[in-house]
UniProtKB/Swiss-Prot annotation:
Belongs to the AVIT (prokineticin) family. Its main location: secreted. Disulfide bonds join C33-C45, C39-C57, C44-C85, C67-C93, C87-C103. Coiled coil: none annotated. The lineage of its organism: Eukaryota, Metazoa, Chordata, Craniata, Vertebrata. Gene3D superfamilies: Lipase, subunit A (2.10.80.10). Expressed at high levels in testis and at lower levels in brain, lung, ovary, spleen, thymus and uterus. Residues 1-26 form the signal peptide. It comes from the Eukaryota. One of its GO terms (cellular component) is extracellular region. This is Prokineticin-2. InterPro entries: Prokineticin, Prokineticin_domain. May function as an output molecule from the suprachiasmatic nucleus (SCN) that transmits behavioral circadian rhythm. May also function locally within the SCN to synchronize output. Potently contracts gastrointestinal (GI) smooth muscle. It comes from Rattus norvegicus. The keyword DNA damage does not apply.
Length: 107
């Protein structure tokens, strides 16, 4: 390894080891939950849009927000299967077109 041409090759081989974080570092997900009771008022524990195996505290639907008609009321003691929470009290999840539901004032 005394050949000066080997230095760039050695650096290239060692660079991934130098840039890799130590094992044990992990992403911290804020707002992670297992059930509604772990979330604050006006929120529910819904499936993450990005990682389906994770549930996060999500705001309940306001007027005009997309919703799912089968989303259970808060608090729900089981595990939610949708990424949306139910609409806020006084609102209903109503169909606006073939495959679209939004939170609207109850009549």
């Amino acid at each position: 390894m005394e050949d000066p041409r080997c230095a760039p090759l050695l650096l290239l081989l060692l660079l991934p080891l130098l840039l890799t974080p130590p094992a044990g570092d992990a992403a911290v997900i804020t707002g992670a939950c297992d059930k509604d009771s772990q979330c604050g008022g006006g929120m529910c524990c819904a499936v993450s849009i990005w990682v389906k195996s994770i549930r996060i505290c999500t705001p309940m639907g306001q007027v005009g927000d997309s919703c799912h008609p089968l989303t259970r009321k808060v608090p729900f003691w089981g595990r939610r299967m949708h990424h949306t929470c139910p609409c806020l009290p006084g609102l209903a999840c109503l169909r606006t077109s073939f495959n679209r539901f939004i939170c609207l004032a109850r009549k």
